[in-house]
Amino acid sequence: MPRKSKTDAGEGVSPVDQIQAYLEQNKGDHYNFEEERSYVVSSGSLLMDIEMGGGIGPGVIRASGLTEGGKTSCALAFAKNFQKMDNAMVVYFKAEGRLTKEMVKRAGIDQDPLKWREIKSNVYETVINLMRQLVQNNDRNFKYMFIIDSMDSLVPKADLEKGPEEANKVAGGALLSSDFLRKMALGLSTRGHICYMISQVRSNVSINPYQKTDAKV
């Protein structure tokens, strides 16, 4: 008759207990003890909502397309419907100058300070640090929709004082997007927040700082 292991005999620590103990000791490194918050925000278009399963929910949404292709207007349409929920605030990071007061008014955005805030900064660290602070220190249980317009215009603080050639990066916007997702995506989706990242799909990516990259869908 084969000899029973300690686990089979009911002795020792089970894997379930080990995992639970580890999670208890490292609460700051995971979201297992937090209840996921789920909802759907309509685009305002029936056809688009059907294609998207009703709209968008918590997590990171990436909207890419041509310059002047309506990406900002689409984001504002989602923002208007997001504001209809209780304790729902839109934080718009204006990293380039496309958004105007007329666009905000035309989209029907509620500009109450607890519903809408525009942050004019293209510094990557400023954007991600403010988002982290709002998500991690949320005693009033707000739901946030962060709109970054656009990822291509964000610049790391260390690059601001460099010359144009020294600071040049191949596909810099994509690199920042990847770093952002690693740091923020899981926390946003678990805690019920949306980050709407606007960017352009580029062709002719080159290490030559004098060669123009073309927007392309």
Each model region followed by its residue ranges:
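Intrinsically disordered, low-complexity linker/loop segments enriched in Gly/Pro
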Residues: 93, 114, 143, 151-152, ...
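Conserved nucleotide-binding/hydrolysis micro-motifs of P-loop NTPases
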Residues: 96-100, 122-125, 151-155, 178, ...
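Phosphate-binding/switch region of NTP-binding enzymes
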Residues: 170-217
